[in-house]
């Protein structure tokens, strides 16, 4: 008979920006859908019976909405079928956790995306890390065999219009 092993409970990440981190610092974030592997974000019109504007279009529009209203500053957002990667600067108040939570709640309620409860974040400490994560994000669909070149991938929001505001 197999014994049940108690797995460690993963700590909930605080997603707070420490006071010593400069305003306008970039964060690499990953938000996963559940269940893993199910394409919720990258369906195209005509595929799988999709006839309306796609969820992916709506997710990127919601990202753009928050960017244009200074809720956050998005440098790059790329959708994969079951997750997204983004590089975003957040205001200290209401902060990263609240901004992401509210955005996920809106997208889930309006467009039916099933998000994983939490998300991953990593502060990008210098220009080298920023370039490294930008390349990683843009190459993700190529590595997964979804397109041949990064510029062929449709599901990208990259405004590159200004530096993060000083909130």
Where are these regions (language model features)?
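Short catalytic/metal-binding and nucleic-acid-binding patches
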Residues: 1-167
């Amino acid at each position: 008979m197999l014994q049940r092993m108690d797995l460690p409970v993963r700590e909930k990440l605080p997603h707070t920006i420490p006071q010593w981190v400069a305003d306008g610092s970039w964060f690499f974030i990953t938000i996963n859908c559940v269940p893993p592997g199910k394409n919720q974000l990258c369906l195209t019109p005509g595929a799988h019976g999709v006839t309306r504007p796609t969820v992916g279009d709506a997710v990127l529009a919601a990202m753009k909405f928050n960017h244009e209203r200074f809720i956050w500053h998005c440098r790059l957002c790329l959708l994969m079928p079951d997750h997204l990667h983004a590089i975003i600067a957040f205001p200290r108040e209401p902060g990263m956790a609240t901004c992401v939570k509210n955005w996920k709640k809106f997208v889930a309620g309006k467009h039916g995306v099933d998000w994983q409860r939490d998300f991953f974040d990593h502060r990008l400490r210098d220009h080298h890390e920023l370039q490294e994560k930008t390349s990683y994000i843009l190459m993700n669909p190529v590595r997964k065999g979804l397109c041949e070149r990064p510029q062929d991938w449709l599901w990208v929001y990259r405004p590159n219009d200004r530096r993060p505001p000083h909130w």
